[in-house]
Amino acid sequence: MERITVTLGERSYPITIAAGLFNEPASFLPLKSGDQVMLVTNETLAPLYLDKIRSVLEQAGVNVDSVTLPDGEKYKSLTVLDTVFTALLQKPHGRDTTLVALGGGVIGDLTGFAAASYQRGVRFIQVPTTLLSQVDSSVGGKTAVNHPLGKNMIGAFYQPASVVVDLDCLKTLPARELASGLAEVIKYGIILDGEFFTWLEDNLDALLRLEGPAMAYCIRRCCELKAEVVAADERETGLRALLNLGHTFGHAIEAEMGYGNWLHGEAVAAGMVMAARTSERLGQFSAADTQRIITLLQRAGLPVHGPREMSAQAYLPHMLRDKKVLAGEMRLVLPLAIGKSEVRGGVPHEIVLSAIADCQQA
């Protein structure tokens, strides 16, 4: 069992990583006998895990209600969020309740925002079931829903009480979802840890085979890196923005193509190549390192170009609504070397458009 602490003073919390955690009531600390819980999950995961977790918690004396939502990025909306509020109010649940997010990034983000908002804030626990959510979205307290004009535009910073990562969940993960998660894994190597990137080059096949030791190390290293960044910059005023490598481009793809048509990791993968090409054009990143990124993404089964039907110009309106924009100026996360990156403003639009167009023709 691996345990990592996200250090935020009185709001610090553990990330527990192991196989078989769903069988142990202690995995869901700080829940205890007599507590009230609302389990939030989706239609895909409910048949796989809902009864198991409900049974484990009820055996420990926890009072469990649940709400099952439709599955998919397009349901990460204010309308579906209201379904959670209605379920909480109908029971009813008070300010001493705990929300448990059982699912991937959509369920985690939406449930976290529900917890941040319901009666001005209640406790919640992240139980991520996809690789992407295990290494990224469940850690750090970013919660949100989408708006038709932009991804994650309505939300809050709100930390969980704990994160429970059961490696066994990956056994039921579709191959496309596994690849999507690997995009965020690869991101950590590009922005923060060149040695980890090299480890990924050497061990990607083991990850694709879901080999336990390799996957446990991979998830632990990603969580360690993110925990360090969040502890230093919880509200994304500086360092934490580096975690958005590829996301400014990727969010444009998701919004333009319709949420869910491209998985988040797929869009981020293409976006990371666009960021690398932009950095190349600025003379601060080598073509050889861009090729290393492309090769690793392709081995993971990820796209390295944007949608053929989306013009370079179509990206700009979305990118100019990005949350990193300051005083109307686009700010991009750009790699400087494998393992080193920066946030840079003032990049001429023609350079960005040229990089996007180059990736469209890849």
UniProtKB/Swiss-Prot annotation:
Which residues does the annotation say bind NAD(+)? 71-76, 105-109, 129-130, 142, 151, 169-172
Q: Per its Swiss-Prot or TrEMBL entry, what cofactor is needed? A: Co(2+); Zn(2+); NAD(+)
Any Gene Ontology biological process: amino acid biosynthetic process
| Record's subcellular location | Cytoplasm
Per the entry, what this protein does is: Catalyzes the conversion of 3-deoxy-D-arabino-heptulosonate 7-phosphate (DAHP) to dehydroquinate (DHQ).
- Family, per entry: Belongs to the sugar phosphate cyclases superfamily. Dehydroquinate synthase family.
User: What protein name applies here?
Assistant: 3-dehydroquinate synthase
Origin organism of this chain?
Answer: Citrobacter koseri (strain ATCC BAA-895 / CDC 4225-83 / SGSC4696)
Q: What is the lineage of its organism?
A: Bacteria, Pseudomonadati, Pseudomonadota, Gammaproteobacteria, Enterobacterales
Q: State the encoding gene.
A: aroB
